[in-house]
A protein has these predicted regions:
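Transmembrane beta-barrel architecture of outer-membrane proteins
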Residues: 1, 32, 58, 84-86, ...
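Extracytoplasmic
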Residues: 1, 11-13, 40-42, 56-60, ...
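Predominantly transmembrane beta-strands of Gram-negative outer membrane beta-barrel pores used
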Residues: 15, 44-48, 60-66, 72-81, ...
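Short acidic/polar hinge/loop motifs at secondary-structure boundaries
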Residues: 21-49, 64
């Protein structure tokens, strides 16, 4: 878990965008960075200057996703001490004007001390289509399930603290040029 601070502003003053769509958590910016996208699906991270909208007093971060290659299928796995395990399945298909990127992952650990365990599930899909006359369509959807112990994070006298967050997001964007504009 981490917070984003830009130019002295807090996480509540920083907008988080995924492929240009605002997914800032309206309840608390503390969870805004918890997007259901694995690092190998990220093609770039842009730091946007100025104030692109409400909730972006300090600035904005745009996370862009793109396939690693036009067409691929990839499985990745890892393991380590304290019961650490990681598995990721991702792939993409690109054909002409259509592109599909999909990924799912699981990451867990028993923790390095009492009540520092975690289990994270991510699923993300993005499909784009450039229609000759109808315009550009961009659909993305994701789901995340995170549970983790936070031993002493909120109060040192209570080591039995934990958090569990569920995130579901989706967007459909349509871009169409009109006339010569």
């Amino acid at each position: 878990q981490a917070d984003i601070f830009i130019r002295g502003g807090s996480f509540d003053q920083t907008m988080v965008l995924l492929n240009g769509i605002d997914f800032t958590d309206a309840r608390t910016g503390h969870q805004s960075h918890s997007l259901p996208v694995d690092i190998d699906c990220i093609s770039a991270v842009d730091l946007l200057d100025g104030v692109p909208g409400v909730g972006a007093f300090a600035g904005a971060v745009n996370i862009r996703t793109a396939p690693l290659k036009p067409t691929y299928l990839r499985f990745e796995g890892a393991g380590g001490q304290h019961g650490y395990a990681y598995a990721n399945l991702s792939g993409a298909v690109t054909s002409g004007r259509f592109s599909l990127l999909a990924a799912g992952s699981y990451r867990r650990s028993d923790g390095y001390r009492h009540n520092t365990e975690f289990a994270n599930y991510n699923a993300f899909v993005r499909a784009t289509y450039e229609a000759p006359r109808a315009g550009f369509f961009d659909l993305q959807a994701g789901y995340q399930n995170r549970a983790f112990g936070s031993n002493g994070f909120y109060a040192a006298y209570n080591p039995e603290q934990c958090e569990h967050t569920l995130t579901a997001l989706a967007s459909l964007r349509w871009l169409q040029s009109v006339g010569r504009f």
